[in-house]
């Protein structure tokens, strides 16, 4: 197997078969947390945070350690990036020391520049545009509740709320890669960028999926297999909550809306959740909710992704399955 440097910067960086490989590997890690240890040594992986985090920090820190590596966790305040050092300079330095970079930051251009100057895998742990690691965990969760990864292709998923945010974008692209029927609903002014919708439709045409963007929450949820939402106000916008939340009340996931989905529909939320806002307590704490499985699967999915990317970079086929 020829070594091939691969990064995970947006959801369509994996094709259909590659996404399946990573998800199958994630399920194996769920059954055996020490299934593979590609970083035995220990070799360091730089884990950078420009934004606060609970799930991403804990899952990558624990995950790299369980893969046999050392997670070098650096906050914005503790790095020269926080003082304006060019991304390219930081990338060149980390590339001489670490065996990969995981970065939770703001602009998508920042992770893309990091990857440009790296000879090891770079993983987008969240940007303003995409959240691909979360989508892998979400799809792993569906697969585990629906009989396996092969059954993802038959799923209809619906995302409600701020349809212009990174989660909506990643559901569009990641769902298209999986061959799902993806529905995204939000109010006017909070819909996905046309270029992202176009990319999702192009991929869906290749995988047999479909894409629907609508302002009608009921249309999106009707007969869906899984319903997703996210906070209506992203990090840094909390002071504007009263103003920003007004357009979204028709998209609250409640028992009435869930009743329009299939009777066995799942509910997922990437967290943190605000009960009584984007979702009611009856739903997120109810029998259809799988949010705690979803949160745990961040660990397994990200370990699978790091292992797969490392296998590609080294030309080591044993790390791909």
Swiss-Prot record:
One of its GO terms (cellular component) is cytoplasm. Keywords: Arginine metabolism, Cytoplasm, Transferase. One of its GO terms (biological process) is arginine catabolic process to ornithine. It comes from the Bacteria. L-ornithine binds at residues 166, 230, 234-235. The keyword Transferase applies. The keyword ATP-binding does not apply. InterPro entries: Asp/Orn_carbamoyltranf_P-bd, Asp/Orn_carbamoylTrfase, Asp/Orn_carbamoylTrfase_sf, Asp_carbamoyltransf_Asp/Orn-bd, Orn/put_carbamltrans, OTCase_ArgI. It is found in: Cytoplasm. Pathway: Amino-acid degradation; L-arginine degradation via ADI pathway; carbamoyl phosphate from L-arginine: step 2/2. GO terms for molecular function: amino acid binding; ornithine carbamoyltransferase activity. It catalyses: carbamoyl phosphate + L-ornithine = L-citrulline + phosphate + H(+). It is an enzyme of class 2 (transferase). Its EC number is 2.1.3.3. Carbamoyl phosphate binds at residues 53-56, 80, 104, 131-134, 270-271, 298. This is Ornithine carbamoyltransferase. It comes from Bifidobacterium longum subsp. infantis (strain ATCC 15697 / DSM 20088 / JCM 1222 / NCTC 11817 / S12). The lineage of its organism: Bacteria, Bacillati, Actinomycetota, Actinomycetes, Bifidobacteriales.
């Amino acid at each position: 197997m020829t070594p091939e440097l691969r990064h995970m910067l947006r959801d369509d960086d994996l094709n259909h078969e590659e996404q399946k490989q990573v998800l199958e590997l994630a399920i194996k890690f769920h059954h055996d947390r020490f299934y593979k240890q590609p970083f035995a040594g220990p070799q360091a992986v730089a884990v950078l945070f420009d934004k606060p985090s609970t799930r991403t920090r804990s899952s990558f820190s624990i995950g790299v350690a369980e893969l046999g590596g050392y997670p070098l966790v650096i906050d914005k305040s503790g790095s020269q990036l926080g003082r304006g050092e060019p991304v390219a300079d930081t990338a060149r330095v980390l590339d001489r020391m670490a065996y990969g970079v995981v970065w939770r930051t703001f602009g998508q251009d920042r992770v893309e520049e990091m990857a440009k100057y790296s000879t090891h895998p770079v993983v987008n742990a969240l940007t303003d545009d995409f959240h691909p690691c979360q989508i892998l965990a979400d799809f792993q969760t569906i697969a585990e509740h629906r009989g396996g990864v092969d059954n993802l292709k038959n799923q209809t998923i619906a995302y409600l709320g701020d349809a212009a945010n990174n989660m909506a974008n990643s559901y569009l692209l990641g769902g298209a890669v999986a061959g799902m029927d993806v529905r995204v609903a939000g109010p006017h002014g909070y819909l996905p960028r046309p270029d992202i919708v176009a990319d999702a439709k192009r991929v869906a045409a290749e995988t047999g999926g479909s894409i629907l963007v609508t302002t009608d929450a009921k249309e999106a949820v009707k007969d869906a297999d899984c319903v997703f939402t996210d906070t209506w106000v992203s990090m840094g916008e909390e002071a504007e909550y009263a103003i920003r939340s007004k357009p979204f009340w028709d998209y609250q996931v409640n028992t009435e809306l869930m009743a329009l989905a299939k009777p066995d529909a799942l509910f997922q939320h990437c967290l943190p959740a605000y009960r009584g806002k984007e979702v009611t307590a009856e739903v997120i704490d109810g029998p259809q909710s799988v949010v705690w499985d979803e949160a745990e699967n961040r660990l397994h999915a990200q370990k699978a992704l790091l292992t797969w990317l490392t296998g590609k970079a080294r030309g080591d086929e044993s790390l791909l399955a």
